[in-house]
């Protein structure tokens, strides 16, 4: 399987970040609280610096938007989107539900993504028109088409719980076959691999999810916000499904 130069760069950057994360994981790293009240560690910063150096060296004309080191040329036609440690709280509490997320957005559309979870042992990637893969195996979403047969996973849903859709979400939960809360990278990997059928989140930012947009869609799924709108830099919620269930879930939440 031949990769584009951009995907090779993203994979190399993810590998470098994984090496750094492994050296610092379960090492009692110092934690600082940022202005937005989220934690940051040495691992977050070092991983992003390493990723940024690789991507900017190979593609100096591309823009960059990172969780820790900020943005450069954010209006560029091609824009890297990077969360070096998505799941910093998991990293700090020493359980393996953290990952590195690297995506490339071109003219407003996500064209490739790499989702690397070194402590969990999963590496997933996708590029437009080339399919999605997990640990070298081609991914495909499920063919489940009925809610009463579907497995639904929810992640960050705090604002959903405080809004008018909460009652509708509860009714949806009662209709599906199985409800879980895998969260973070894992439920997107599972969705792309046909292990679950839908994912709902109401509190995300684009850096959390951009790579998984590419992975889910290249596996045959559909990825929008909770209103059904396409993913943009401003997206804060997620409905991701195998595609067959998308309209039904949107209708249930409307």
What is the meaning of each model-derived region?
Residues 32, 72-74, 107, 125, ...:
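Solvent-exposed alpha-helices and their adjacent loops that cap or buttress functional pockets
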Residues 21, 44, 55, 88, ...:
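Residue-level signal for inorganic ion chemistry
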Residues 44, 48, 67-68, 83-86, ...:
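Acidic active-site catalytic centers that drive phospho-/nucleotidyl reactions
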Residues 134-135, 140:
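A structural micro-motif at secondary-structure boundaries
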Residues 1-85, 244-245, 251:
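N-terminal subdomain of lithium-sensitive/metallo-dependent phosphomonoesterases centered on the IMPase/IPPase/PAP
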Residues 74-133, 148:
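DPxDG-like acidic metal-binding loop motif
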Residues 140-254:
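An extended, acidic
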């Amino acid at each position: 399987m031949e990769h584009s130069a951009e995907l090779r760069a993203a994979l190399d950057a993810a590998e470098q970040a994984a090496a750094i994360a492994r050296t610092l994981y379960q090492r009692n790293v110092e934690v600082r609280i940022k202005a937005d009240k989220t934690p940051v560690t040495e691992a977050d910063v070092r991983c992003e610096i390493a990723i940024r150096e690789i991507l900017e060296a190979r593609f100096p004309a591309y823009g960059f938007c990172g969780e820790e080191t900020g943005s450069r040329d954010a209006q560029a036609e091609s824009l890297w989107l990077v969360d070096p440690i998505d799941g910093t709280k998991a990293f700090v509490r020493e359980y393996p539900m953290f990952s590195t997320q690297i995506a490339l957005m071109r003219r407003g559309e996500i064209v490739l993504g790499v989702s690397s979870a070194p402590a969990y042992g999963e590496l997933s990637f996708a590029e437009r028109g080339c399919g999605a893969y997990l640990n070298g195996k081609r991914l495909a979403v499920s063919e489940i088409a009925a809610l009463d047969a579907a497995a639904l996973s929810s992640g960050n849903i705090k604002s959903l719980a405080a809004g008018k859709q909460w009652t509708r979400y509860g009714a949806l939960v009662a209709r599906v076959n199985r409800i879980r809360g895998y969260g973070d990278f894992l439920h997107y990997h599972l969705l792309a691999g046909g292990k679950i059928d839908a994912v709902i989140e109401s509190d995300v930012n684009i850096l959390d999810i951009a790579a998984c947009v590419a992975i889910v869609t290249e596996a045959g799924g559909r990825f929008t916000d909770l209103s059904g709108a396409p993913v943009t830099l401003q997206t804060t919620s997620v409905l991701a499904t195998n595609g067959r269930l998308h309209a039904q879930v949107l209708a249930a939440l409307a």
